[in-house]
C-alpha cells in the first residue's frame, strides 16, 4: 500500500499489522524539501502529518518503507535526504526522479502538465536535471556504501546489483524491453 501518510490512525495500523501490509510512505525529505511540492488540498504543508503517520506506524509495529521524489530543489541534497530517511526509521528507500513536462495552456497561458512528447512541451522547472539526479544518487551511494550496506536498502542499488549478479530485474527500467510494466497516473 502506498500512502502520503497524512490520514494514518491506530485503526488503520491495526488493519495493516493484522494483514501483514507493507506500507510505503511518500515523503521527499526534510520539511523544506517535502513541503515545497507536497501540499494539502488547501495549499498547506503536509510534513508534520506525514511524520506523525510514520511515528504511528513505528509505534504500532507496522512495516514501512519510504518513496521519495527527487526534484530540482532536492537534487544537490542526496546525503541529507538519505540521512533524514534513516532518522525516520526507514530501512528500505526508493528515490524516483521527477520528470514532468509542461506547456502553456491555451486559455490561461499558465503552465499545464502534459505527457512527454507533446508538441511545444518542455521539461518543467521543478523537474530534476539528469546531472542533478545522478549527483543525488551518487551522494546517496557514497553514504550507503561506506556505512550502511546490509543494514539499509536503496531500491535502485539493490536492483542494479542483483542484475549484475544475473537476477532478473525487479524494475521495468532495468528490463528488456523497457516499458512492459503498467503505470497509473493521476492525470
Regions of interest found by a model, annotated:
Residues 1-31:
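Conserved SAM/AdoMet-binding glycine-rich loop
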Residues 23-24, 50-54:
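A conserved non-catalytic segment of reverse transcriptases
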Residues 36-48, 55, 59-187:
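Radical SAM enzyme [4Fe-4S]-AdoMet core and its adjacent flexible, acidic
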Amino acid at each position: 500500500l502506498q500512502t502520503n501518510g497524512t490520514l494514518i490512525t491506530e485503526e488503520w495500523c491495526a488493519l495493516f499489522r493484522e494483514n501483514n501490509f507493507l506500507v510505503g510512505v511518500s515523503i521527499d525529505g526534510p520539511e523544506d524539501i517535502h513541503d515545497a511540492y507536497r501540499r494539502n488540498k488547501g495549499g498547506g504543508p503536509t510534513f508534520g502529518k506525514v511524520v506523525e503517520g510514520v511515528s504511528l506506524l513505528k509505534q504500532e509495529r507496522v512495516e514501512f518503507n519510504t518513496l521519495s521524489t527527487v526534484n530540482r530543489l532536492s537534487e544537490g541534497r542526496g546525503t541529507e535526504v538519505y540521512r533524514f530517511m534513516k532518522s525516520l526509521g526507514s530501512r528500505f528507500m526508493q528515490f524516483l526522479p521527477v520528470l514532468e513536462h509542461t506547456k502553456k495552456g491555451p486559455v490561461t497561458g499558465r503552465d499545464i502538465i502534459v505527457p512527454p512528447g507533446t508538441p511545444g512541451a518542455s521539461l518543467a522547472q521543478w523537474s530534476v536535471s539528469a546531472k542533478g539526479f545522478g549527483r543525488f544518487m551518487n551522494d546517496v551511494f557514497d553514504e550507503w556504501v561506506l556505512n550502511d550496506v546490509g543494514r539499509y536498502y536503496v531500491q535502485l542499488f539493490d536492483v542494479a546489483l542483483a542484475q549484475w549478479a544475473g537476477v532478473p530485474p525487479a524494475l521495468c527500467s532495468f528490463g528488456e524491453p523497457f516499458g512492459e510494466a503498467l503505470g497509473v497516473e493521476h492525470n
